[in-house]
């Protein structure tokens, strides 16, 4: 079975409970659409679990990108403003060389991936006017990292589709889309599927969501 999660944000306990709920095994595959750390109190526990699992695949999110840029520039301000302090504290307590290893790993992460008829991405995509004349490879190859990690404007618009592909995204908590903390669940809108249920935001009734691609079953912790 193939599963997708996003925006776990250091919520390690919920992450482990989700793996137990879906009976995740070595025969399954899990794709995490970025933002695995920051804000929550156990960010590197999740990351270390992913690093040790051949069948769990991380895509880059904007929080991974902020760490990457902070490492390169030495300017931590944007990363810290967005909750990077919880991650940095754990990095400091790791062995020498861990931060460099983490940087090299994150630097190489993909920011968009196609699984059958699903396009997996953290935030958004660029839809050119002629996109339906393109092959899937051409469409994916024209995507830019900043759009895929930050953009909220395109995915979900009724005019922005690519053939019969569904686009699965995180980044924008569903509470921000519905303007409600009630009935928090995955949103299907047009060709887009929003799976960030704001796990780290408990005051907003945040949940960790997981979508099984094989039958579209939804799971929540």
Feature roles, as predicted:
Residues 188-221:
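Binuclear metal-dependent phosphoesterase catalytic core
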Residues 1-48:
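N-terminal active-site segment of His-dependent metallophosphoesterases
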């Amino acid at each position: 079975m193939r599963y997708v999660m996003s925006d776990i944000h250091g919520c390690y306990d919920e992450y482990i409970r989700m793996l137990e709920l879906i009976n995740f095994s070595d025969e399954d595959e899990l794709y995490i659409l970025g933002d695995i750390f920051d804000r929550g109190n156990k960010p590197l526990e999740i990351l270390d679990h992913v690093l040790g699992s051949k069948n769990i695949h991380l895509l880059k999110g904007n929080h991974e990108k902020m760490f990457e840029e902070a490492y390169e520039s030495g300017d931590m301000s944007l990363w810290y403003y967005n909750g990077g302090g919880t991650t940095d504290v754990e990095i400091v307590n790791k062995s020498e060389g861990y931060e460099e290893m983490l940087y090299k790993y994150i630097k190489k992460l993909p920011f968009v991936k196609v699984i059958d008829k699903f396009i997996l991405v953290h935030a958004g995509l660029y839809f050119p006017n002629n996109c339906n004349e393109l092959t899937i490879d051409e469409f994916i190859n024209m995507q830019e990292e900043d759009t895929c990690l930050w953009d909220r404007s395109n995915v979900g618009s009724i005019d922005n589709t690519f053939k019969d592909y569904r686009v699965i995204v995180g980044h924008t908590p569903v509470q921000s889309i519905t303007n409600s903390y009630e009935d928090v669940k995955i949103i299907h809108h047009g060709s887009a599927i929003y799976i960030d249920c704001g796990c780290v935001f408990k005051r907003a009734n945040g949940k960790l969501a997981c979508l099984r691609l094989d039958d579209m079953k939804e799971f929540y912790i």
